[in-house]
């Protein structure tokens, strides 16, 4: 299996086991859900009526005042009271076996390759850290939204792209299923291709 680099027009051989893998939609969905759940902090919490400070004394007598009966100022019906069904801290993290995770990444990368959304370049380097120069480089490649995967991310490339919502840049070790699916294109350097093949073997 071969792919042509868009800058030098040279042919690059790809490993069929990684770049021509059968697409498994269920596994990809599981990998995406697991990744997003693992990113959740789960720190949202409120207090029930028993946890809110104060409210131990009955506000007024049960009868004789003409007011509605009340047993505590921390009732959920009251201002500053507890929450009826208070949410608590919880762990949303899920486990996905390494083999399954690798297969999910293979599925996504292979599908990108099949649909023509995987773009290979011989190298990707920016002369400076300016965002306008980074955008100019991407416009020359006619790519409006992309994840750029490099073997090692340089400072200029990182600084030039970090303020743009339509572009993201990462090295091979930090590839994740959500980023691969989020952008229109995935731009990969030749050096990164070799590392991806080693990592997902």
From Swiss-Prot:
This protein's record includes keyword Oxidoreductase: no
Renumbered residue ranges of the record's region Disordered: 42-67
A GO BP annotation: translation
InterPro entries per the UniProt record, alphabetical: Ribosomal_uL4, Ribosomal_uL4-like, Ribosomal_uL4_dom_sf
Pfam families in the cross-refs: Ribosomal_L4
SUPFAM superfamilies: Ribosomal protein L4
Entry-linked Gene3D superfamilies: 3.40.1370.10
Single GO term (MF): structural constituent of ribosome
UniProt keyword Iron, yes or no: no
Stated role: One of the primary rRNA binding proteins, this protein initially binds near the 5'-end of the 23S rRNA. It is important during the early stages of 50S assembly. It makes multiple contacts with different domains of the 23S rRNA in the assembled 50S subunit and ribosome.
Protein family according to the UniProt entry: Belongs to the universal ribosomal protein uL4 family.
Summary of subunit composition and partner proteins: Part of the 50S ribosomal subunit.
UniProt protein name: Large ribosomal subunit protein uL4
Protein encoded by which gene: rplD
């Amino acid at each position: 299996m071969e792919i042509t680099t868009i800058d030098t027009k040279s042919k690059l051989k790809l490993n069929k086991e990684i770049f021509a893998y059968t697409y498994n939609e269920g596994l990809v969905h599981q990998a995406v859900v697991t990744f997003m759940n693992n990113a959740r902090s789960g720190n949202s919490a409120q207090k029930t009526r028993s946890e809110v400070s104060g409210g131990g004394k009955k506000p007024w007598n049960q009868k004789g005042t003409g007011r509605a009966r009340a047993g505590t100022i921390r009732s959920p019906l009251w201002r500053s009271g507890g929450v009826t069904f208070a949410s608590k801290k919880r762990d949303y993290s899920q486990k996905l076996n390494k083999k399954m995770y690798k297969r999910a990444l293979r599925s996504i990368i292979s599908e990108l390759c099949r649909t023509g959304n995987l773009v290979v370049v011989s190298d990707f380097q920016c002369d400076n850290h300016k965002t306008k120069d980074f955008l100019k480089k991407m416009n020359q490649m006619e790519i409006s939204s992309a994840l750029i995967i490099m073997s090692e991310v340089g400072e200029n490339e990182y600084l030039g792209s970090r303020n743009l919502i339509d572009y993201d840049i990462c090295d091979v070790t930090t590839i994740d299923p959500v980023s691969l699916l989020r952008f229109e294109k995935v731009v990969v350097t030749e050096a990164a291709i070799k590392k991806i093949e080693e990592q997902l073997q």
